[in-house]
UniProtKB/Swiss-Prot annotation:
MF (Gene Ontology): DNA-binding transcription factor activity, RNA polymerase II-specific; RNA polymerase II cis-regulatory region sequence-specific DNA binding; RNA polymerase II-specific DNA-binding transcription factor binding; sequence-specific DNA binding
Chief location bin: nucleus
Organism: Caenorhabditis elegans
Species classification: Eukaryota, Metazoa, Ecdysozoa, Nematoda, Chromadorea
Keywords: DNA-binding, Nucleus, Transcription, Transcription regulation
Distribution of this protein across tissues and organs: Isoform a, isoform b, isoform c and isoform d are expressed in the spermatheca.
Region annotated Disordered, chain positions: 1-52, 216-264
Name of the protein in question: Transcription factor jun-1
Phenotype of null mutants: Sixty percent of animals display an egg laying defective phenotype. Animals display numerous defects in the reproductive system and have a reduced brood size.
Secretion signal span: none
Record localization: Nucleus
GO biological process: determination of adult lifespan; positive regulation of gene expression; positive regulation of RNA splicing; positive regulation of transcription by RNA polymerase II; regulation of cell cycle; regulation of cell population proliferation; response to starvation; response to steroid hormone
Cited PROSITE patterns: BZIP, BZIP_BASIC
Length: 319
């Protein structure tokens, strides 16, 4: 009896074991699906970060290239050892890669004209036409970030003298950033308007001329006003042409109407002249008839007088 009683639990365990075996593989499959989804999401996030980083760094590469073309600087040979060189030595539209911290420092210092890009003794350092006193290396970290902030946000540059105890260094830094702020603003606006593709970079002479105007202190509002005045003058010229055409058409219609009116007047004058001639001829005929009647009347009087003189009384006729 004990063996018979012990057998059911064994059968129950054997019946439960296949269920456990069937349920076990489902858990890892779900984990794999979840892991694939997570990987896809991570890959999408990484791609978005790469695109945003490339878009953010593209402005600095464009700024550096425009500064190089403005200063007419040419690289020579293997004396150049700069982290920016692989980008600058390629074609005008090179692929954009995320920049490191050292690349950012090199770009900022080359824009300010304080640090040479080349390390060879035969190549002169890159300098701006309006070269100002140097900035200390201790201010480089804060300086790079504050230059970017001042270029992105319009207004006076934001600079503190926490790292530089000397007030003259702070004044020099402020003047340098103020001098280069119009160029940086133009670079930021041009890069944000362009796409992330390298072949869509806006490195054209008109942009460079606009930057030179901004650097020389020419107000962009004046140029906008000039463009507005030109467009207004063109619109005025177009309106003048339209008004002239309308006036010519009106004059042509007036000339046609005047011609018709003169023709009607001439026709009426001819009709009246014909009527005058007709009335003259009629008057002449009436005058001739009147003469004939006067002659007949005179002849009748003479006849009556002759009869009365011969003794023929005629009381009905009275002279």
């Amino acid at each position: 009896m004990e063996e018979d009683q012990e057998e059911p639990p064994s059968s129950s365990t054997s019946s439960e074991s296949p269920e456990v075996v069937l349920k076990a593989p489902k858990a890892p499959t779900r984990r794999r699906k979840n892991s694939k989804k997570d990987r896809r999401q991570d890959m999408e996030v990484d791609d978005g970060e790469k695109e945003s980083t490339a878009q953010y760094c593209k402005g600095f590469y464009d700024a550096l290239r425009v500064m190089q073309t403005t200063n007419k600087y040419e690289f020579t040979g293997g004396a150049v050892s700069s982290p920016v060189l692989p980008v600058l030595q390629t074609a005008a539209f090179s692929p954009i890669t995320p920049a490191s911290a050292s690349d950012m420092h090199t770009i900022v210092m080359s824009l300010l004209g304080n640090t040479p890009i080349t390390s060879g003794p035969s190549i002169a350092p890159l300098s701006s036409p309006t070269l100002l006193p140097l900035v200390t290396s201790g201010d480089l970290d804060d300086l790079s970030m504050k230059i970017l902030a001042s270029s992105a946000i319009p207004g006076p540059p934001i600079i503190s003298s926490s790292n530089s105890p000397d007030s003259s260094t702070t004044a020099v830094t402020t003047s340098q950033i103020t001098a280069f702020q119009p160029l940086l603003n133009n670079f930021v606006s041009s890069t944000t308007a362009s796409t992330s593709r390298p072949d869509k970079l806006n490195l054209t002479p008109p942009q460079q001329s606009a930057e030179i105007y901004a650097f020389n202190g020419v107000n962009s509002d004046d140029s906008d006003g000039g463009l507005d005045s030109r467009s207004a003058s063109r619109c005025g010229m177009a309106l003048d042409d339209q008004e002239k055409k309308k006036l010519e058409r009106k004059r042509a219609r007036n000339r046609q109407a005047a011609t018709k009116c003169r023709q009607k007047k001439m026709d009426r004058i001819k009709e009246l002249e014909e009527q005058v001639l007709h009335e003259k001829h009629r008057g002449q005929r009436l005058d001739a008839e009147l003469l004939e009647l006067n002659r007949a009347l005179e002849h009748f009087r003479r006849t009556v007088e002759h009869h009365s003189g011969n003794g023929c009384p005629n009381n009905s006729i009275r002279v």
